[in-house]
């Protein structure tokens, strides 16, 4: 059996790659090791409407949960402030339904999708699965963070996310909690799916994520757990090469998730779109430079922002709770209003800088990170 392109991994980036390649009339097979497209759903599910539109997705009723109205940011000592996020037009979506929606788009273009089919290895002419050998011209690695584990473990954090029912979850109101002792290098989050229902998670370096999340929930109040997801997240930015021979790497497998939040529906999704367009052009012309255009386009679009986010991550990792508390004290109503007025959810380094109070306390921050701070502010 032969396909022009085989995509391993049925998540957003892989499915968008398949959609783009098949839209040009080329044969595409997508294989997914899980029993269903869209599982396990380890994504928080936040994305801007503008981002979805650029990906070519109009969320269906099943996909769209609700608009996010605000984000409450809490420091280690419990001080907090709230950002109005209505201007950013951020929505909470069901990743399971979003992935299925894109799978349907790809299938309508002619792509074949198979679940409960696992990739085993690359062969001379294609790949071997748990069922058979299949020939192809292009192999797309969309396996997520699992594809990176053997390459560089230093960019990986453990995470846990529970889907729960709890009266203290309020529709439209996201919460982010910083605490370098409990969630070193990351944070805890509450993302509502509806009134009294949502996703609560934590990530951090060297922590027992299950115990830490259980303790966090215990302190919040009564709840019922309906789903638990444990998954590694990648925070080190893009890998060096998105294309190696006839292998094209997309999404989390290519490090296309944001270094600050590990979110990547838009940035990874655009990786899939650019990759699919490049693969289709290559299959038509057989010119290798067509494949190289994928990394070139993605880097032109997201490269500088990801560099700044990596620097912001370095700053956060060097701060202790005392420093974060002091920086939170410098956040003024003007800073909060400035962030609230922004309408760009997907390019947000400037907001992160202000959230940490760095512009309001340049002296303090400079003693922490010196030259790195100048780069990120520049």
What are these model-predicted stretches?
Residues 1-13:
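Beta1/beta-strand and adjacent pyrophosphate-binding region of the FAD-binding site
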Residues 5, 26-28, 139, 174:
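Hydrophobic anchor at the start of a short beta-strand
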Residues 10, 105-225, 239, 255:
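Predominantly flavin-linked oxidoreductase catalytic cores and closely associated redox partners
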Residues 13, 36, 146:
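Conserved Rossmann-like nucleotide-cofactor binding loop
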Residues 22-42:
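Glycine-rich FAD pyrophosphate-binding loop
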Residues 50-101:
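A conserved beta-strand/loop capping segment in the N-terminal third of enzymes
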Residues 206-284, 293:
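FAD/FMN-dependent oxidoreductases across multiple families
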Residues 280-378:
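C-terminal helical "tail/cap" subdomain of flavin- and related membrane-associated enzymes
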